[in-house]
Every structure is written in structure tokens, then in C-alpha cells.
């Protein structure tokens, strides 16, 4: 009887401990919401604005505007991107580029799913190679 009880308790404890651990990454690998750059406070990544294109996960990078040659234009790197998260890296392709191959960058979603760190795929802060974005919506 004692062996039976021990044999029942251990699996129950293992199941209970596994229930408390969840992966913040959605099972389909697609993020949602609007995320703001921790340092600039203005650069935003919006995962909800663009519809999926040909099955690809997409986001819109909004960097604001600047005046160039007397014209008010979007800041460099603004626009639509396709992405695919693979472990601790993200493949990013700027959809306004003539290049076909996506570029890999470091990527790490926080344990609580409220922020992520990503390699510098756009010129957010000069000299900074990894950037933190926090979810605001």
C-alpha cells in the first residue's frame, strides 16, 4: 500500500509542477499587440496592424517622421516586416526591400511575456546592438 501511495504521489507532484510553467511564446510563434522601444519611447512595433500575407507573420515598425530635403518622410527602417521566430533568434525581412532573404537577429521574449529583446534590425539607437521593447497594448 505504501508503494502504491508513493507511486501515485510522485506523478501528481510532477504534473502539478509542470502546470505552473507556461511558455510566453504563442504556439504559432506569432506575437500580438503594440510594443514600444524602452529607450526611445517612440519607436513602436505593431503586430496587430498588418494582416498575415501569404501565411507569413508580419508587423509594422513605426518610427515617426523626419524632415529630409524639405520633405516630411518616415524615419529609416519604418514600414512592414515579415518575421519568423526560431528559438532565440528571429528572421526579419523588410517588405519594402528588394532583397529576398530574411536576416537573422537575436530575440528573447521575457518569461512574463511583457517585453522582448531584439537585435538591431533598424537604426533605433546609434551604437546599441540589442534593443528592449515593452508591451503597451
Predicted regions and their residues:
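Short beta-strand segments that buttress and anchor functional surface loops
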Residues: 35-37, 90-97, 117-121
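Short, surface-exposed coil-to-beta transition loops
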Residues: 40-46, 74-79, 100-105, 126-130
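Edge beta-strand at a domain terminus
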Residues: 20, 24, 77-83, 87, ...
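N-terminal helix-cap/turn-to-beta initiation motif at the start of protein domains
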Residues: 20-36
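C-terminal motif of bacterial Sec signal peptides marking the signal peptidase cleavage site
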Residues: 15-18
Amino acid at each position: 500500500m505504501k508503494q502504491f501511495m508513493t507511486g501515485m504521489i510522485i506523478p501528481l507532484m510532477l504534473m502539478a509542477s509542470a502546470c505552473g510553467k507556461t511558455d510566453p511564446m504563442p504556439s504559432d510563434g506569432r506575437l500580438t499587440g503594440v510594443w514600444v522601444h524602452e529607450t526611445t519611447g517612440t519607436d513602436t512595433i505593431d503586430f496587430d496592424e498588418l494582416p498575415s500575407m501569404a501565411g507569413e507573420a508580419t508587423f509594422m515598425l513605426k518610427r515617426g517622421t523626419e524632415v529630409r530635403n524639405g520633405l516630411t518622410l518616415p524615419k529609416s527602417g519604418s514600414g512592414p516586416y515579415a518575421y519568423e521566430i526560431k528559438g532565440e533568434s528571429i528572421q526579419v525581412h523588410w517588405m519594402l526591400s528588394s532583397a529576398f532573404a530574411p536576416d537573422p537577429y537575436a530575440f528573447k521574449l521575457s518569461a512574463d511575456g511583457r517585453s522582448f529583446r531584439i537585435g538591431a534590425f533598424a537604426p533605433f539607437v546609434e551604437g546599441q546592438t540589442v534593443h528592449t521593447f515593452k508591451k503597451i497594448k
